[in-house]
Every structure is written in structure tokens, then in C-alpha cells.
Curated annotation (Swiss-Prot):
May act as a membrane anchor for the chloroethene reductive dehalogenase VcrA. Belongs to the PceB family. It comes from Dehalococcoides mccartyi (strain VS). Induction: Cotranscribed with vcrA and vcrC. This is Probable chloroethene reductive dehalogenase membrane anchor protein. The keyword Membrane applies. The chain crosses the membrane at residues 3-23, 35-55, 64-84. GO terms for cellular component: plasma membrane. It is a multi-pass membrane protein. It is found in: Cell membrane. Keywords: Cell membrane, Membrane, Transmembrane, Transmembrane helix.
Length: 93
């Protein structure tokens, strides 16, 4: 197991903990569809990171690593933006 996965797990745990404490502090609740969109975006982002790292490190395919990584990261941003927009619209009311 590479060290990148250890540090990625630590960063993910710290980031999610900070996000949940910020939600509690600002009294923000999420609906079920916002949870689904957030988890989908997070999984796509993790897939992009893992694919880019594995393709570049083990297969030495830098071009395909970056092309697929960028495409999947762009796809990961879409559900996260929809969830953030939905929460912002509800909180502003």
C-alpha cells in the first residue's frame, strides 16, 4: 500500500470532519438528494485521483492518466455544484 492512500485517507477524514462541524455550527441540514449528490461527487473525485496516480505510477501512461483524470474531475464537480446550489438556495430563504 502506498503512502499516498494513507495521506489521502487522513486528508479526507479531516476535511469531512471540518465540513460536518461547519454544517452544525451554521445550522445547515442536508436533504437526501444532496447527500447522494455529494457522495457521488466525492466518489468520482476519489476515482479520478486513484486512476491518475495508478496510471502514471504503475503503467507510465501519463497522457491517459491526465486525460481521464481531468474528465472525471470535471464530472465530479457537476453533482457537487448542484448540491451546493440547492443548499445555498434553501439557506438564503
Amino acid at each position: 500500500m502506498d503512502a499516498i492512500y494513507f495521506f489521502l485517507t487522513i486528508a479526507l477524514a479531516v476535511g469531512l470532519t471540518m465540513l460536518f462541524t461547519w454544517f452544525k455550527k451554521n445550522n445547515i441540514t442536508l436533504k437526501w438528494n444532496e447527500w447522494v449528490l455529494g457522495i457521488l461527487g466525492l466518489l468520482l473525485a476519489l476515482f479520478a485521483i486513484q486512476h491518475t496516480y495508478a496510471s502514471a505510477t504503475y503503467e507510465f501512461e501519463y497522457t491517459s492518466a491526465w486525460i481521464v483524470g481531468v474528465i472525471v474531475l470535471l464530472l465530479a464537480v457537476v453533482p457537487l455544484l448542484f448540491a451546493a446550489r440547492s443548499v445555498r438556495r434553501r439557506v438564503d430563504k
